[in-house]
Amino acid sequence: MKIALLHTAESNISIFQKAASEIGLPQGALHHEVRADLLAAAEKAGGLTQEIARETGAALLELARNADAVVLACSTLGPAIAEVENAIEVPVLRVDAALAKKAVKSGGLVVAICAVETTRAPTTRLFTEAAQSTGAQVEIRLVPGAWELFKTGDRAGYLAAIAEAAEAAYDDGATIVALAQASMAGAADLVANGPKPLSSPTAGLAAAVELLSMRS
């Protein structure tokens, strides 16, 4: 089994390797490709443009040539899957799609935490659509200043800010908190009140494995 991942941050590779180990994937099961330029372009443009979506789609197509499944690990670029999903023979997934499905499953108030402004719109659409079948109430919260901490290399400060936002969401009555960006996964262990927040790396990889097992 080989799962190819398209990242926009080098630091996310170790996060997904940890998630792979947690769900029992063997060493070498993941192949990583990092395209930081795609997220940088989206941030500069104020969101995902058609041109950036095409570039993302081309990268996904290339990864699919030597993989059993492809996972797009960037929430901002997520909608770009629509460019190629019908042209790729292997499963291609948004890492946050499985997260959204899991988060809304039991209904209640679901708070999805974002750090990047360009992620807010695609995350809102994704979680709102997922909630239609369960009746969950969805709220998207952007954490001011968090992404600047990430980009300057202050990982500890970044995760602390995300954890603080998650705890605030629970204080405000959230049933479950979803950490919408893969880079946030480490913050789940820092949250002291409420259920452990859900994160996308484990959910996304588990969904890919499930799809592959259904096809075999």
Predicted regions span which residues?
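Non-catalytic structural scaffold of enzyme domains
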Residues: 1-216
